[in-house]
Structure formats: C-alpha cells, structure tokens
C-alpha cells in the first residue's frame, strides 16, 4: 500500500491519470491525498470530479478556494466569473451527488501516525496544530449543515477581517478561518494576512513573510503538505514543508509525491492543462 499526495488539479484530469499510471496507483490498496483546488480553469472540471468521486474511498481531500467557490456558485450561479469553467458541473445531471460529496471534505487533514498535515494554503504561524484542527472543524461542520451552508457561502468572500481573534463570531469568524486555510500566502508573525500579493517570495510586502517562513511558527514540529501557491514552483527551503502546486493549469507541471518515500513524479503540462509529449519525470520540483 502506497500513499501519494498530488498538487492542485484545477480540472486537469489527463496529467493526473498519467501520474497515477506512472506510479502504478491501485485504488483498491493505495491512497491519494488531494491538496484542494480540484476544479476550475482547466479543460475537464466535471470529468475530474466524476473521476475522483468514482475512487472516493481511496481519497483524502482538503478543500481549496476554487472548490469553495464552486459550492457558492452551486447555490448562486451569479457568483460565476468569466474565467470560471464550472457551469457544466452545476448543470450536470449528477451535480447534487458531486456537490454533496464535495461539501463533506475537510479543510485540514492530519495523519497522526505519520505526523503529517495537509492543507490547501497553509496554517498561520500563531496557531498550534491542535488549534488549527479545532477551527477547521468549525467550518467543516457548517459546510455539512443544510441550515447554515448558504449563509456561510454567501458570506465567505472578502479580505476582512485580516487577522484572527478569539472574539470573532458568526460569518466573520468563519471567513478568516477559511482565508487562512484556503487563500493565505503572506502574513505577519501574528497572523495578519496580505491577500493581494500572489507572486513568488520576492513579492512579500514589507513586514510580511510566507506563512511557513516565520521562525516561531507554532506548527513547525509537523510536516505540512500544501498547494495553492503556483508561483513557488514547488520550491520551499524550509524543512518539513512540501509545496505541491507546480502550476499545471498555467503550463507548468503537476506533481505527485510519495508521502512515505519522498519520491516525486512530475508531469509537464501545456497551457491547455494537458500533458506535454514525454512529460513524465522523477525530478523534484
């Protein structure tokens, strides 16, 4: 039995299938961890969700910002933007089945025997792993609650509040928790977010660092696998931090990581989100 983690799919199904074939992935015995952003911008968002649903018993999945955006558009189609490639999912005959599965996924996964956490964007430096799991569970509970789901999805958009406080309540509390787990790149040591800068490390605003680069980060004893930040190209010079979004949908690559052996497989991609000829290699990003 092998366990793999894969970077942001964003509706790019063929590179995923190429990687799984190369790794001899067997859904009957192996496990696949997904760092979120399963859909959007790529050519096969609906097919990707259907494929994942078909092997759902082999998956561990955390939600990304694009997945939450899809759930919001499911409840209010006016949320769709020109650049979104999500309408076919909303209009699909099996949409309700797919959405019900999607909303039951996690924001943060922790594999205690391995000492490894997986999250889409990151864990802010001021939270312990225990605190992060506790707050992730608050949002996960709302996602699975028919009575509160729509209110949360309507209110989750926005950059404020930009810092956690235990005194936050209601949708503002849920929004900042969501932003940490699904949108964060740069923050201060006390967790104040900058959600505008989206490029590489050199684009850090004054007084801000990548969330994983704060020396007193309270989750530093835990190995963390994350996606979201394609501009990093998978390069993070911090022990125990594994970045897997290597920009497949932008003409970069899709990266598969063996959680136990540390081996990487990479599939180089076209800007259309399809594999390049002779695209597979075993180089670390």
UniProtKB/Swiss-Prot annotation:
Cross-referenced InterPro entries: ApaH, Calcineurin-like_PHP_ApaH, Metallo-depent_PP-like
Single GO molecular function: bis(5'-nucleosyl)-tetraphosphatase (symmetrical) activity
SUPFAM superfamilies membership: Metallo-dependent phosphatases
Reaction equations catalysed: P(1),P(4)-bis(5'-adenosyl) tetraphosphate + H2O = 2 ADP + 2 H(+)
Keywords, comma-separated and alphabetical: Hydrolase
EC number: 3.6.1.41
Keyword Hydrolase among record annotations: yes
Assigned protein family: Belongs to the Ap4A hydrolase family.
PANTHER family given in the database record: CYTOCHROME C5 (PTHR40942:SF4), PTHR40942
Role of this protein: Hydrolyzes diadenosine 5',5'''-P1,P4-tetraphosphate to yield ADP.
Protein known as: Bis(5'-nucleosyl)-tetraphosphatase, symmetrical
Source species of the chain: Pseudomonas entomophila (strain L48)
